[in-house]
Every structure is written in structure tokens, then in C-alpha cells.
Amino acid sequence: MGLKHFLEKIEPHFLPGGKHEKWYALYEAAATIFYTSGAVTRKAAHVRDALDSKRMMILVWLALFPAMFYGMYNVGAQAFGALTPDLLQQNIANDWHYAFANALGINMSSEAGVSDKMLFGAIYFLPIYATVFVVGGFWEVLFATVRKHEINEGFFVTSILFALIVPPTLPLWQAALGISFGVVVAKEVFGGTGKNFMNPALAGRAFLFFAYPANLSGDAVWTAVDGYSGATALAQWAAHGADGLKNAVTGQTITWMDAFIGKLPGSIGEVSTLALLIGGAFIVFARIASWRIIAGVMIGMIAMSSLFNFIGSDTNAMFAMPWYWHLVVGGFAIGMLFMATDPVSASFTNVGKWWYGALIGVMCVLIRVVNPAYPEGMMLAILFANLFAPIFDYFVAQANIKRRKARSNG
């Protein structure tokens, strides 16, 4: 018996009147992973496309894999570089991640190979991702079952994005709390997928940032070594300018290429601009992400950073950060490529996408430079722009209406 025949055989049990009808959302989610839905339109308008929403979300999910794999490697690389023999023994005794890595025989030294660093990073990342996926998936299934809706695959993207934009040291219960806020409050309360006006992953991270700032900011959360502190590149620049960009372990200067590749501490998936550009190029080529939004973000960021460079400041080193450094530090790249381009919370109109993207770029630099307490600005910039996306679309639509009326009256 083939899989398709088996699914067709059990489908009546999940339809209205069947003994398992309340679990239809789960059946539909599993069945459409392997086969497209048999539903067809019965009246206009008919839209034909080779890519349905499920496949589109899975492609975005896969596009994040380069950043995910490099992020896991970097977690190990940063930790092993910071470890001393005393810190290693202390962490093995007090941290289950280290105890598990030690039981697996992982070489936790500065001489460790790529596989050891990758496996160590996976011990930190995978529990966070699994927690986010299970807890967020529970809320998705619950709301889909109550509303008798299908389970939307957008959660594949939300879950991995959330796991990639948090520090590797985030407690699992906070990961569960953050994704719960993002899914329930930022999405399901407004009607579910397609009706949320904010990016759920960013909303969840913002909730954690303001509720538990000690676990998402400061110098002690970015390197997975208890008892070690190491500032991010943004924090170093804000404190000491370009000359302050130093590797906390070796004392060597962090170059632009180091930052571009991702040889620095930070949230798991945001560190490597190179890996993010690989995935971003794929979703732009597949016409999933809007190139207009990405271009708008870059234009806004370059314009605002150039303005601050021109103004200058003797007391604020962030005024001197050039645009090409803004691009490779913090969460700018992952925000621009994978969050600003969220088709639900972004502007719909082509002109609106330019303004929406430009606002994100401007606000990101403005927050980074002017707010001394918060050197990272991409998260708040995107959430702020999400609120303005419908306004941009409204004015674009009104301008088109006025233009058509003027033509018809002329």
C-alpha cells in the first residue's frame, strides 16, 4: 500500500462526522507535507502558482540552515577559545551542557576541530530550538483545532528564527515563554497567520528583552562559558570606537572580514553575514523575499549612517561607524533578509515596500547611534516599521486612486 493510498484511506475519519474529526488539523498538516492539497477554487479569482504557502515556508526554513550551522560552529568556537582549565572543570561540574559534552568525549579546548565545535554548539542550540518548536507548535495546534483551521507552516520559519536570534545561554523556560508570547499574543490573538501586524519571532524576543534583560543583553550571555564575559562588537564600538574592536581572548583586532564571516560573539544565528547572504540570495532568487524591501533597508541605513558620519561627535563613538560596519555587526543582516521581508507584516504595495524598508534602515541606525543603553537597533526598528506598513500602503493606494480619477476627468 502506497503512502498516498494510505492517506486517502484514513482521511474520512478526520473529516466532519468522522471519529477523529477534531484532529483534522494535524492530519492535514502531515498529509500536505508529502502531497499538495486536493482543494480547488470553485469561482473566480483563480490563481495558478507552482509554489504553495507550505513549500514557500519550507524553502525559507531551509534558507536559514547556513546561518544555523555556522551559528552552532561559532558557539563552540567562541566557548573553546574562552575556556581555561579551571573554567572547564567548573562548567563541567555546574552546567549540564558541558557535562553532556564531556560524556560524549568532545574535545573542549582551543585545539578542538570543526566537528567538536559544531557538536558542542548543537548541544546548546538544539534544546532551544526543540523547546521553541514543541511549545510554539502546541499553541499552533491548539488554536487551529479550536478554530477548525489548518495548521500553517509559517511556524517552521517563526520557530527557527526565534531560536537563531537569542543568545546560546538563554534558559529553556524563557525560550518557551518568549515563543508563547510571540505566537499567542502577537499572532493568534489577531486571528492567526495572515492577520498579525507584527513579526511573531521578533515580538517574542522583544518581550524577553524587556521582561528579562539580564538574559538577553550585557556581556555575559553571548559566550557559552559560565564565569566569562565578552562584549559584542556593537558594544565594543559604542564604548571605545573602532579601536575597541578586540577579540576578548587573544586581544587581536577584529577586522571587517572577521565580522563578515562571523568570528565574533552574538546571538546564535546573527553572527555570520556571509551565511545569511547565501540564504537571503536564495529566497530573493525564488521570489519569496522582496528585493525592494532589502534595497530600501540598505538605502535607509547607508543614508542615516552617512549623515551621522558627517555630523560627527567627540563623545559618542557610534557616530563614526560607517555603513559597511553596520551591515556586518549585530542583527542587521538577519533582520533585513529574513524578518523585514516577512510578507504578512511588511507593506504589500511596491512603492510602500521602498518606504517601509527605508524606515527600518533609518530607525536601526538611529537607535544604535543615539540610544546609549541599547547599541542594537534592528529588532525595535522592524517592529516600529510593522506598525507603519499599513499606513504606507494606504497612502500609496490613495495616490493611485487620485491619479486614476485625474486621468478619467481629464
UniProtKB/Swiss-Prot annotation:
The entry's keywords: Cell inner membrane, Cell membrane, Flavoprotein, FMN, Ion transport, Membrane, NAD, Phosphoprotein, Sodium, Sodium transport, Translocase, Transmembrane, Transmembrane helix, Transport, Ubiquinone
GO biological process entries: respiratory electron transport chain; sodium ion transport; transmembrane transport
Required cofactor(s): FMN
Domain of life: Bacteria
Cellular-component GO terms for this entry: plasma membrane
Transmembrane regions: 56-76, 119-139, 159-179, 266-286, 293-313, 318-338, 347-367, 377-397
UniProt-listed InterPro entries: NqrB, NqrB/RnfD
EC number of this enzyme: 7.2.1.1
Primary enzyme class: translocase
Primary location: membrane
Signal peptide: none
GO MF annotations in UniProt: FMN binding; oxidoreductase activity, acting on NAD(P)H, quinone or similar compound as acceptor
Purpose: NQR complex catalyzes the reduction of ubiquinone-1 to ubiquinol by two successive reactions, coupled with the transport of Na(+) ions from the cytoplasm to the periplasm. NqrA to NqrE are probably involved in the second step, the conversion of ubisemiquinone to ubiquinol.
Family: Belongs to the NqrB/RnfD family.
Assembly and interaction partners: Composed of six subunits; NqrA, NqrB, NqrC, NqrD, NqrE and NqrF.
Name by which UniProt lists this protein: Na(+)-translocating NADH-quinone reductase subunit B
Organism, scientific name: Neisseria meningitidis serogroup B (strain ATCC BAA-335 / MC58)
Gene: nqrB
